[in-house]
Every structure is written in structure tokens, then in C-alpha cells.
Amino acid sequence: MGQTVTTPLSLTLEHWGDVQRIASNQSVDVKKRRWVTFCSAEWPTFDVGWPQDGTFNLDIILQVKSKVFSPGPHGHPDQVPYIVTWEAIAYEPPPWVKPFVSPKLSPSPTAPILPSGPSTQPPPRSALYPALTPSIKPRPSKPQVLSDDGGPLIDLLTEDPPPYGEQGPSSSDGDGDREEATSTSEIPAPSPMVSRLRGKRDPPAADSTTSRAFPLRLGGNGQKNNNPSFSEDPGKLTALIESVLTTHQPTWDDCQQLLGTLLTGEEKQRVLLEARKAVRGNDGRPTQMPNEVNAAFPLERPDWDYTTPE
């Protein structure tokens, strides 16, 4: 007797620090009083099966989310941070939530694979000389986003990439075949400084699809005073940001620095929420699936390689 029943709502209140951390990862901010009000009094009136004590059922959460994100007067923009955080908790539950989440259904058993007959291919022949495998060069690390408090923002549109040195003519003598047969392990590995200089000096090949990224140089917090406010004139600032994205192909870190420099915290949060709402699924229409939204518009730094064309 005297034992209290643990509910999803009470569980989130007991781990409120983790809830705020998850909300911060979604670039939103939540308050405890409004968290309780929306869960116990507002969302049960949507008639989608939301209980007053809350739930971690992802299907019900997505139905509430569709009501919150409804366009026009039927939407609830003030509830967006809270339902997005509920969705993140249910989609990737922390340890204290996993006991309350329904286990995923195991895949149906498949028919056993029959062993194939004896192979009719001839046995492989051993080579007289060992095969030479080319050495795999390490993937270049992501450049650090640097800032120059003294430079104006117009440098982003007029700055040219650093010049490249001319590439020396290739040797055309008859020793090419013997050089290719030489083991690559005999060539000493260049030092990190030499590799960095060489990567900036050697131009890419004619048929190469590798992209090269250069860090943006922003002018610090003074750029908010030198450019129009996004709330007052969103069209002019949007055109400026689009021109930077087109001419410089910035990385994920560059985009975060660009938004943080030109927008206020509230404006940046509104832009991120609208961008995630505009993500389209395979059918070409806006999607609400968390995995598709996070894959197309990640809020945390993704493991992307900026040297590839995609």
C-alpha cells in the first residue's frame, strides 16, 4: 500500500534533465509546466487516443504531431517543441524509457536456404608473384570553421579560392611499367604538413568528381547590424544566404555558423522548424517520419564527406 503508479508523464518529470537535453538536441526549449498542461489537458482532446498520463506509442505521437503541425488556424505552433521532444524520446528511448516501450515485432521466419550443388568452376590458380594492392589514403578531416572578426560579410561573395600551382608534366619514358610494379610500401609516408600543402597545390584530375570545401570567414556578431533583420525583411536575407550556399558549397558546420551569425536565436529556431516541416518523402509530399526528416535535415553534425559530390 502507498505505492505510486509510474506513468510516462511522471517518468519524464523524474528525468526532467534528460528531457531538456533531448529537447536541446532538437534545437527547441521546453518548460515543465507547459509540458504537463499539453500532455494531461490539451492532447487528450485531439481524439487520437492520447491518454492523460502520456504515452510512448510512436503511432499516437505521430497523430498528435499531425494535429499540431496542421496549417492555418487549426495548427498549434506553441506545442511544436513539446511534441517533437516526445517523438524523439519514443523514437530513440533512453535507458529509463525502454522498459515502457513496446518491443518491436520479430521478423517472420523464412524458408531455409537449400545448399547449392558442387561448383563447376575450375579451382583458382595461385599467382607466381603476390598481388599488389594500392594503399588507401586516409580520408581528409573536416576543416575547422574559422571566423575573422575584421572581415565584412561581402567577402563571402567576392573571395576567390586560393590559387593552385601548375602541375608538372608526367614522365613519358619506358620505365612506367616497372614503377607500377614497385610495392607502395617502399614509398615513405609524407608528413601531415606536407600532405596538407600538397592537397592545396595539386589540382584535381580532369575526370575527378571530388569536391573541395573552403571554410567560410564571417565577420562575427557585427554582421547582424550590417544586414537587414530576417523578421523585418526575410526576402533580402534569404537571397544573401542562398547566394552563399550556391557559390561556396558550405559544410554543415559552416551553415550553423552562418545561421548563428545572421539570425537571432528565435529566428534560427523558426527557420529550423520550418525547414524540417518541408522535408519531402519518397512520394514527393512533406513527410513526418522522424528517420526521413533526420536523414534529410539533421540537427546534429552528420558523418558526411564533403569531398564527395553529394
From Swiss-Prot:
Gene Ontology MF terms: RNA binding; structural constituent of virion
Lineage: superkingdom: Viruses
Lipid-substituted positions (N-myristoyl glycine): G2
Extent of motif LYPX(n)L motif: 128-132
Transmembrane portions of the chain: none
UniProt motif (PTAP/PSAP motif) ranges: 109-112
Keywords: Capsid protein, Host cell membrane, Host membrane, Host-virus interaction, Lipoprotein, Membrane, Myristate, RNA-binding, Viral budding, Viral budding via the host ESCRT complexes, Viral matrix protein, Viral release from host cell, Virion
Record region (Disordered): 107-234, 281-310
GO CC list: host cell plasma membrane; membrane; viral capsid
Motif (PPXY motif): 161-164
Biological process terms in GO annotation: viral budding via host ESCRT complex
Site (Cleavage): Y129, P130, F214, P215
Note: This protein is synthesized as a Gag-Fos-Fox polyprotein.
Protein's name in the database: Gag polyprotein
Organism: FBR murine osteosarcoma virus
